[in-house]
């Protein structure tokens, strides 16, 4: 049996990151998701036995195959948590643990992911929060809890792990908490994302950032 598999659910490319419209076009948003997925999987593959991309989108699955990743076609009439259940059912009996994370945390390489994964060998449940009370990563045995990804899922996941006596351990990571949804998030990638495919792509789009004082800490603009 393998030690750990990565599970990454990916939504349809053409429906992704609508909050970045009109700052980025549909094609640019699709390309952004591709480079972010590459950044995430390039880091994750160093520390996992297999990475599984689950999606209902054939374009996503074909792109994942081009990155030499394993793929699962999401069942019909599914949603995020049902898709994760499907992926974990596939993993059960094949691997001791799974690490579940989104495709839009391109700064993952700046955290000590090896340390987190190594510690999971002695711990039953590790959770990494996202900004705003969500969850960006869970490491656990397949199907150890029923996932509740969505708004304010962090507390729900911790409570679910407590009910199963899994002694949940929280790992705070600035870089893994940053999932990309807004133009200010793009600015954070410009500031912190040196040596990432995502930052290189944003610079190709002539996206610039400057520090400001106010409710928005970063001013993000596009050059001509």
UniProtKB/Swiss-Prot annotation:
Keyword GTP-binding annotated: yes
EC number from the UniProt entry: 2.7.7.68
Recorded superkingdom: Archaea
Reactions mediated catalytically: (2S)-2-phospholactate + GTP + H(+) = (2S)-lactyl-2-diphospho-5'-guanosine + diphosphate
Pathway: Cofactor biosynthesis; coenzyme F420 biosynthesis
GO terms (BP aspect): F420-0 metabolic process
Family statement drawn from the similarity comment of this UniProt entry: Belongs to the CofC family.
Known function: Guanylyltransferase that catalyzes the activation of (2S)-2-phospholactate (2-PL) as (2S)-lactyl-2-diphospho-5'-guanosine, via the condensation of 2-PL with GTP. It is involved in the biosynthesis of coenzyme F420, a hydride carrier cofactor.
Protein name: 2-phospho-L-lactate guanylyltransferase
């Amino acid at each position: 049996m393998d030690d750990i598999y990565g599970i990454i659910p990916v939504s349809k490319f053409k429906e992704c990151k609508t909050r970045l419209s009109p700052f980025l076009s549909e094609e640019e948003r699709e390309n952004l998701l591709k480079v972010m997925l590459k950044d995430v999987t390039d880091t994750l593959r160093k520390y996992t036995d297999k990475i599984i991309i689950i999606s209902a989108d054939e374009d996503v699955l074909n792109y994942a195959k081009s990155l030499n990743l394993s793929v699962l076609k999401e069942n019909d009439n599914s949603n995020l948590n049902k898709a994760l259940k499907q992926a974990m059912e596939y993993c059960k009996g094949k691997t001791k643990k799974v690490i579940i994370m989104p495709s839009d945390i391109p700064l993952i390489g700046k955290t000590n992911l090896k340390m987190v994964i190594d510690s999971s060998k002695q711990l039953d449940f590790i959770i990494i929060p996202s900004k705003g009370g969500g969850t960006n990563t869970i490491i656990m045995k397949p199907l150890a809890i029923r996932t509740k990804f969505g708004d304010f899922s962090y507390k729900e996941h911790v409570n679910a792990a407590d009910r199963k006596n899994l002694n949940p351990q929280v790992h705070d990571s600035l870089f893994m908490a940053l999932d990309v949804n807004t133009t200010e998030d793009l600015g954070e990638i410009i500031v912190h994302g040196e040596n990432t495919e995502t930052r290189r792509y944003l610079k190709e789009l002539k996206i610039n950032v400057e520090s400001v004082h106010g409710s928005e800490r970063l001013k993000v603009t596009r050059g001509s």
